[in-house]
Amino acid sequence: MASAKLLQDLLQAARQSTGHDEIVRAEDAFFKALLKSTVYAHVPLEPPPPGRMRFVQFVRPDNGQTVLPFFSDREQAEFAAGNVRAIIAMAGRELLEQTRGATLMLNPNVDQIALYPAEVDAILAGQSIGTFSKEVITESEQVGACPPSCPTDALTSILREHFATEPWVRAAYLVELHRGPEFADISLFLGLVVAGAHHERLLQLTTLWLKTALKDWSMPLSILLCNPDEKLPEIFHQGIQFYGT
């Protein structure tokens, strides 16, 4: 079993990593250790029906999603449980297997790591879930934008297939960006119009879908999500719309 301290150290390493490959290795190491760690979850005080296991869930105040909390150490679990919930300990792999189909949140009062069902399936299968980092384009930066000049049919086909099952995705755009000295740094920009409560979920799932289906994709890809009631960013109009109306 991996200790709670080791798990926290691996999480810290993943958050401090910078380069893409370094982040992937750190996150893979963290989730591999999570499966082998003892984790803690909340269950009702009253006993469950014979042959069944019941877990406590809560509704996130930030987006209204129902999540099942679990914890990497007993102290966090006890603090959150108070006197109204019981605590159960089990291996991380066992918890993920028993709660398949639920959205999980690791250490909701500290780390707030949301794991959606498709990500849980990937972790249990020993696969990477996809990696992203936040980036800021300043107003002073000169950026060129145009429709994609490289083949993108595989990318847009995969995303259209998945977005068709997500009613919260209203539209999707793809733009080619030119940045850096002489605009020589080329990347793709994916713009999504998504209901605000589902921004996090669609960001994480889109990253997973692309990681799983396009293993040989090498061009950097940035993602920006905006709400349906917001004015569409001008940069969206510089590329192509491949989904929605």
Give a label for each model feature.
Residues M1-T245:
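An interfacial alpha-helical scaffold signature
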